[in-house]
A protein has these predicted regions:
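N-terminal intrinsically disordered/low-complexity leader segments
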Residues: 1-10, 200-212
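N-terminal positioning helix adjacent to the helix-turn-helix/winged-helix DNA-binding module
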Residues: 4, 10-14, 18, 157
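Helix-turn-helix
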Residues: 14, 22-56, 60
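Alpha-helical DNA-contacting segments of helix-turn-helix folds
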Residues: 51, 58-72, 114
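Hydrophobic alpha-helical connector segments
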Residues: 60, 75-105, 161
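Amphipathic alpha-helical packing segments from all-alpha helical-bundle domains
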Residues: 71, 91, 102-109, 121-148, ...
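Secondary-structure edge/capping motif, primarily at the C-terminal ends of alpha-helices
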Residues: 76-84, 111-118, 172-176
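Hydrophobic/aromatic-rich alpha-helical bundle segments in the mid-to-C-terminal region
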Residues: 112, 145-191, 199, 203-208
Length: 212
């Protein structure tokens, strides 16, 4: 059973890899199932053992690729936290966002694919296997819990941050308009701080030092 399951995983991974290559080169609308199986060197019937249609492949790829970006960003943040102490949870959130942006900056094809197709539902339900299968939302939540501040409507707050980053970085990274990404970051991160402050609960003790 182990070998059989391993072969199944390999076939599914090969189909996903082939589809990702074609989707990023041609777009999903211009890619057919026949082209995917040809690229993966498999029979067309094999495709339907794993996926209902190419849209299901797309959803799987979006979740997988975004998952990897977030996983690497979280690992980078954790490494930084081992090396130094940060005074606020806001700085931790910004470091996480910065790690995500830097990955997308280095991989424009990935940015095009994720930004065009990543819905809030997909993002909020993504699970990171290497982090005990936790939701991406759980990672944000764990950062917020490190703070002695309390936040209201945390899901809405995170939604606003994610959508802000997604909307502002796309044209800046891909088309370099209206500014370069390094110039955008300063104002973007200040806006993220403002969002976090806006959602602070009135019960938070403003005089208490915040540790992250």
């Amino acid at each position: 059973m182990g070998k059989i399951e391993d072969k199944k995983r390999q076939k599914k991974a090969a189909l996903l890899s082939a589809a990702y290559k074609l989707f990023t080169e041609k777009g999903i609308d211009n890619t057919s199932v026949s082209e995917i199986v040809k690229e993966a060197k498999m029979a067309k019937g094999t495709f339907y053992l794993y996926f209902k249609d190419k849209n299901e492949v797309q959803d799987c790829l979006i979740a997988t690729q975004a998952n990897r970006v977030f996983e690497r960003a979280n690992l980078e943040l954790n490494n930084l936290l081992v090396e130094q102490h940060f005074e606020s949870v806001e700085e931790c959130v910004i470091l996480l966002v910065d790690a995500v942006i830097n990955q997308l900056k280095d991989n424009p094809s990935l940015l095009r694919f994720i930004s065009k197709n990543l819905s809030w539902g997909v993002f909020s339900n993504m699970r990171i296997v290497d982090l005990d299968n936790r939701h991406c939302m759980d990672i944000f939540d764990s950062l917020l819990q490190m703070s002695k501040k309390k936040y209201r409507q945390k899901e809405l707050m995170i939604f606003m941050i994610v959508e802000l980053v997604n909307a502002t970085c796309y044209n800046v990274i891909l088309n370099h308009v209206p500014v370069e990404i390094d110039e955008l970051k300063k104002d973007l991160y200040q806006t993220i701080r403002s969002i976090l402050h806006q959602f602070e609960s009135v019960e938070s003790d403003k005089k208490t030092a915040v540790a992250c």
